[in-house]
């Protein structure tokens, strides 16, 4: 074997060589083959084909030329690849079912929607379409840069002027190395309207752009289901758009029906679609179809007829066809294009911005080119004017000169002319000396001066240049714009977000002591008289009971604040709806709580982005904090810190406020403090709070609520033994934050410690929940109004071992409630049809943890009435005693 010269051997590490070679190949595919330029929307092969057509003068007014000649010219001059790839690209640009606005006018067989290939290039002919001229317009006016071709013997454009936004209008598709692009076509009128809107308002949002650009407009028409996928694609550059065939159900006599498909989704092979339908019928996966035929023709367009059996439901069959065949499919949007030579994922606005900047550059460069030409011509005309003014001397000078060079030098010296002006005079024909020609030169010169002034104004003022771009785009829109083909159907299944699939209704979300959660319709609980026994709201496990309850809409957010000061978020519909007797699902199946973490408060919120609403926090040791609600708008699955506090403290309650309310904090031993929210400076999400109330020994905070400073609301107090009362908020004077508070109830063995303190207007209903899962619904107006020192009246009869665990209030919007007598006599669990809306949530804090007990009546109604009357009398006595000692009590703050 002969030895190779050492100078020709270059030793390389194979790993490095493979890496560099693959990167070179990848970049070549990305930049020079597979991805379109964001400015003209063309890949190199398409750009070279169109430029080749332009160079051959194959305009729409010229005869067609053989495709083989076009392909050969493009391959030899600009695209040194296989002729088949060039021809296939040209064929696609000629197909009116592939391009929304075809760029090649083909004559002959250029394929079909059934997947039929085009005839060989030796049989077909082609030329440019009229709209293609707009892609190439002004290309010879230095509007774009030219680069060397593959062998350096020719020049080709790096990008076309593209006087309309072709990237969005005709879309693009390509597979590169490690990335791919798939951009849907759009309506020319809509896209140009979007560019015009952007030019007038650079800060326009994508939602505002979508008022102009409704969505993709496919050449095969069809339907697009909803705008959610479109909006996602326009905002992020990626998304999935649901496309559906246009199908009608027609009567065909004898009670029979047929399904007629007249439009199919973009890029769907019609023949394969029909084969798929036939296959499903053959395999008996779809029943009821008796005949299937393709009646498509040039006269009728697409027409696929599906005959339906007489006893079959055509609508059901059509829905099955949508589900199981390409009659309905999706278009995966991936808007990747070359931006400054680099692949980039762009959204709708970015695509329009890059195009608009390209057009400004094209118009600016064209204006500079025209200005240069105009100044050159004006310069020549100035010389001719001088010559005409001194024609006799000019002729004498020329006659006396021996050579052209001497004549030119003499003219330059004597009349102060430039070389170009002198040459123009020497080249001037004698007929230009006539009076008519003199007038033409003068008129042309004056017109040129005006034209130069206009061009200079365009270059001097960006707004004038931008207006010129707008005018030219508007002209193209008027010439080539057409009606939208694809219909966007709103309200379809695919247009709906998750929450849109679920009816918006008022619900109750309950959370048990052992952290089992569920939701129920709020109408499950019927309204009853005070002192009723309630209905079973859930079946609890051993030593478990309902600890918290909120009323809200299925579409609202529910925030879960834990004893550790963390916050989690769910939508109302994300909580499983179960039966009234069901225990629910473990809360850890819905949110990721830590082992020793429990829910302190649930709050329903409609708008988490609100800058006008605040959250007020209260801890067991009397610490309070106020934070903007918007701080909690983005909460991930793992939750976020809502408040920091000491290790021996825990979060008790959180309330939603407007920022101008009074804060009410109540304790288990019946102390309550009222102070203005304005004394709480808004803090960050993770900040610790400040002292809200000074606690006496052994006391803890059990309730937090808010009230308007001018309101006529009342403070509702509920005790663990089922007693409650209403006291006007005005009886609680405004004091400084951090005080000990004043007495809000008399605590006895009969009524027990406080479990809930909240504000009411008297128009609400009250839901009281026991540790046994029993829920009763009361009209707040039926609860007696007492002074601060009163013990309250019985709200609910409790069985042995039962106590009140939580309380919530709801507003009534319908007075059509069940009759009170019927409610007392009813032994079923049927509910009243009452529509309600969330007003507030008042989760209590259970002090005991005893197990469940059977509901038993331990007192007769007559004895209960006597006890209540006697207790009301004792309450009034206690009020008189309390009022005498108020000053001494208040001085302890």
From Swiss-Prot:
SUPFAM superfamilies found in the cross-reference section: GyrA/ParC C-terminal domain-like, Type II DNA topoisomerase
Motif (GyrA-box): 528-534
E.C. number: 5.6.2.2
Span list, region Disordered: 810-893
Family annotation (Pfam families): DNA_gyraseA_C, DNA_topoisoIV
CDD domains: TOP4c
Subunit structure: Heterotetramer, composed of two GyrA and two GyrB chains. In the heterotetramer, GyrA contains the active site tyrosine that forms a transient covalent intermediate with DNA, while GyrB binds cofactors and catalyzes ATP hydrolysis.
Function: A type II topoisomerase that negatively supercoils closed circular double-stranded (ds) DNA in an ATP-dependent manner to modulate DNA topology and maintain chromosomes in an underwound state. Negative supercoiling favors strand separation, and DNA replication, transcription, recombination and repair, all of which involve strand separation. Also able to catalyze the interconversion of other topological isomers of dsDNA rings, including catenanes and knotted rings. Type II topoisomerases break and join 2 DNA strands simultaneously in an ATP-dependent manner.
Protein name: DNA gyrase subunit A
